[in-house]
Amino acid sequence: VVTPVMLVLLLALNVFTILKVKALEESAGGDKTEDVAQENDVTIGGEYVIKATTQISDAYKSGNTSNLSDKDKETLNMAKSVLDEIITDGMSDYEKELAVYKWMTANIGFDSGSMTVVPGDDSKPVDNPNGVLKNHEAVCVGYATTFRLFMQMLGIDCMVVHDSYLSHSWDLVKLDGQWYHT
């Protein structure tokens, strides 16, 4: 249960995150936020690890899957199938982001039963794009990394934001030069 105090803290953290992203962007000399902000290999709530998705999106863009594991190839094929279904020529970045957002909210449920992870139990992964796209269920980290994968595949800047205190993750997506929480 989220209390009013927790909501105020979360809003304050969101404002802090936006300011931090802007400061990182300025200190990096432009749009290099992703290079200086750590978003991968971060453990959330001691249970979920934010995994990198760049290798999969790079394979999508280049058409070269030779460096991908079988699991990553499977993830790529599932993600590509979704994009082929919802993205059309001539869409703006905003329209692409909105199409992905709508698809995810309509097709991926929140798996509250997986809030406690049993170490070594990978029977129903809900914290990574492969499991999310296969099972159509996710926890926040799964939503965030899957959304980021789609954005990377579409060439739209996106990063996973994490709050270790509240054990929560979400995305920042850059549209028309501005960062937005998603």
Predicted regions and their residues:
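Alpha-helix capping and helix-loop boundary segments enriched in small/acidic/polar residues
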Residues: 27-30, 70, 135-138, 162
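Sec-dependent N-terminal signal peptides of Gram-positive bacterial secreted proteins and lipoproteins
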Residues: 2-18
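Hydrophobic/aromatic-rich core segments of domains that either
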Residues: 141-182
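Conserved active-site-adjacent core of cysteine acyl-enzyme catalytic domains
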Residues: 118-138, 142-149, 153
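Sec-dependent signal peptide cleavage junction
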Residues: 15-29
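Secondary-structure boundary elements
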Residues: 65, 71-132
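Active-site rim recognition segments
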Residues: 49-55, 127-131, 174-182
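N-terminal low-complexity, Pro/Thr/Ser-rich intrinsically disordered segments
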Residues: 34-75
